[in-house]
Amino acid sequence: MKSSRRVLLKLACGAMAAAGLGLHRAAALAQKPTFRDADRTRDKIVALVRSFGSDDPRAMRHIQKIEPITEISIPGVTVAPDQLPLMDYFVGDLHLRYSFDNPEFVSSVSAGDLKRLGLKREQLLPLSVENFRRLYPGRKIEYPLPEIALVTDAGDLEPCLMLDAAFWEKESQRRGSAIIAAAPARDVLMFSDRSARGNVDLLKKLTVDVYATVGKEALSKTVFLWNRGRWEAFA
């Protein structure tokens, strides 16, 4: 998350706690994509967390079940099947879009890329988690409110941490409590423990406020529960 955005989020969290104010976020800059295979290597593949943008029950997964989305089309554009972006269902209204990490634009991974790189489809998820850990070893956990942890310094890909099961198992054990988390925007991931009911209510309010203010960068209003090694839609 960009430093100015992080400071703004922290200030807004404090203001909300004191006066019920919402959160604000700087607008993203438009970028003109330039794709080169030399930049599209296996060590840059990550899984972007994205939203279906609706509550269509056909797309919803109340319990995490990561599996390929097979019916993909790009409106108004004719694309060869092996050039379509590779995407997976995730949990709730969230899905995964595999991409080559680039701070300027989304460069989607396709079946053609898998062939070029000698990868199998089932390798994408574990490779993405491994790459995210390696690419952003300096990510931080900050506390804009005592009850709320905020993931920062992860290249605007903070919600990708939701895919790192080892992190959440360790965090749950450290806290001695089940973990609740929310990704209301493409670069915002907040979490807390479920031990106090007030934590759920506070995280939900923050999530709704962020979601309402970030426009096209919004992800989900749902609070998710880490339970038995997977996420569940919780509140």
Predicted feature descriptions by range:
Residues K32-P144, A149, G155:
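Charged, alpha-helical interface segments at or near domain boundaries
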Residues P159-E171:
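Short amphipathic alpha-helix segments
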Residues R197-A235:
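C-terminal structured domains
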Residues E171-A178:
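Short amphipathic beta-strand starts and helix->beta connectors
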Residues Y143-L150, A182-D193:
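Short glycine-rich, basic-tinged beta-strand/loop micro-motifs
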Residues M1-A15:
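N-terminal secretory signal peptides and thylakoid transit peptides that target proteins
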Residues R139-P144, I180-A181, E217-S220:
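Flexible, glycine/charged-enriched surface loops at secondary-structure junctions
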Residues G22-T34:
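C-terminal segment of N-terminal export signals and the immediately downstream linker at the start
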